[in-house]
Amino acid sequence: MAFHKLVKNSAYYSRFQTKFKRRRQGKTDYYARKRLITQAKNKYNAPKYRLVVRFTNRDIITQMVTSEINGDKIFAAAYSHELRAYGINHGLTNWAAAYATGLLLARRVLAKLGLDKTFTGVEEPNGEYTLTEAAETEDGERRPFKAILDVGLARTSTGARVFGVMKGASDGGIFIPHSENRFPGYDIETEELDTEVLKKYIYGGHVAEYMETLADDDEERYKSQFVKYIEDDVEADSLEELYAEAHKQIRADPFRKYVSDAPKKSKEEWKAESLKYKKAKLSREERKARVEAKIKQLLAEQDE
């Protein structure tokens, strides 16, 4: 097949259509988003809620979002750094923290709607695959609050942390349509879920196992990797109890605020902190002087 060079003439540019900004930036999958937000045409004023999950290097962001013409509206949000208020101070981006963050969001959403007593979810997680069902009330049968998982551009591989958030929100009392084939412990060949493996991940058992293995094999690396755990006397044996207690506290008060012992920084201090890493813009004279200095340096090196 002959090679045809793409001619970018005036006609090409006049007819060129730019893609959406967030597509150009690689932030939004509009093919998926269209299907997530499109509502049935025979429903009016019935918002379609999405459980939005995003991961950063140090945090997990979970939001309950609905889409409107003017833009997305956030009904409630929960972040993994808020887990410090419930005793979880380390490993705020692991699978167990993802589960706890999902649970925190679910309890907040239901508390705001006044449904937290009607839909309690799974109070003691055992790794079983469950979906939130309708509850019997004095006024008759009440359907649960429904949301759809929105993972953005994250990989949906088996055992991914996004499904930890989903499991936490599901156990928290929200109905999220899903199957068991993406949880840790699911065997593709037998098509069965090992509930013990999933339970281990919920309570941070995989972290505890790694801590014990590393402590035996490479003590120096263990001390450097888990230095914060060691400083706070958090041992591998105590992790399960720590997460179980955090789950109880989240259910008791999902709106608890974390109060840090460190003194609060003023606006001036934060500004000075940010300016520390920001390079000052050089003036024309400074740029010219810098170029002249480099030329002199090069000439001196050549003479040598």
Swiss-Prot record:
GO biological process, alphabetically ordered: ribosomal large subunit assembly; translation
Claim: Ribosomal protein is one of the keywords in the record: yes
One GO CC annotation: cytosolic large ribosomal subunit
Compartment(s) where it occurs, according to its Swiss-Prot or TrEMBL record: Cytoplasm
Source organism, top-level taxon: Eukaryota
Entry keyword Ribonucleoprotein: yes
InterPro entries: Rbsml_uL18_euk (IPR005485), Ribosomal_uL18_C_euk (IPR025607)
MF annotations from Gene Ontology: 5S rRNA binding; structural constituent of ribosome
Function: Component of the ribosome, a large ribonucleoprotein complex responsible for the synthesis of proteins in the cell. The small ribosomal subunit (SSU) binds messenger RNAs (mRNAs) and translates the encoded message by selecting cognate aminoacyl-transfer RNA (tRNA) molecules. The large subunit (LSU) contains the ribosomal catalytic site termed the peptidyl transferase center (PTC), which catalyzes the formation of peptide bonds, thereby polymerizing the amino acids delivered by tRNAs into a polypeptide chain.
Sequence similarity: Belongs to the universal ribosomal protein uL18 family.
The protein, known as: Large ribosomal subunit protein uL18
